[in-house]
Amino acid sequence: PKVADESVTAPKNVSAVTEEVVAPKSEKAEEPIADQTIRIHVKKLPEENKETQGLWTWDDVEKPSENWPTGAQSFKDAKTDDYGYYLDVKLKNEQAKKISFLINNVKGDNITGDKSIELLSPKMNEAWLDDKFKVYSYQPQAEGTVRVNYYRTDGNYDKKSLWYWGDVKNPSSAAWPDGTDFTATGKYGRYIDI
């Protein structure tokens, strides 16, 4: 396969943010992600029969796929969570920068087109494909929302807040300088969904 034309992107900018929302909660516990592994989440598979589809990988992976089209990592081995399916792919080494992949079927169709994930940091170990197979470095937010992450190396989030106004459904309403506190905790520190 050729080098992918589409790289991982952050969620699109939202010019008219609508309301504060609660982060999605996982109903199924995921297994921990092993070191030097990236977990690729897929919202839905392109075809109904997952046993005839696979994840074909190349570039900075431990074992690039071989023997087209049946050498892909089969989705029959995929696990499920509240987002959809996921497969874990071992990286070549700690300096891995780019994972290229596609979803194919045993007939040899490249169903999704070539995709790639640029590893934004050595700690990045997950990527998500939405229902149109667009790649994200972050679990896609609900339409019309934006997540603001705030990470402090000292872990002190007391009296740290965010002010938002303008095209939002519920602008900050406290008196200055008291904004909305960062109370939710996620993979990248504290966050607020707007």
Pin down the residues of each PLM region.
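Short, surface-exposed binding/anchoring microloops in extracellular/periplasmic proteins
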Residues: 36-53, 144-160
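Aromatic-rich carbohydrate-binding modules that target alpha-glucans
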Residues: 48-94, 106-114, 156-194
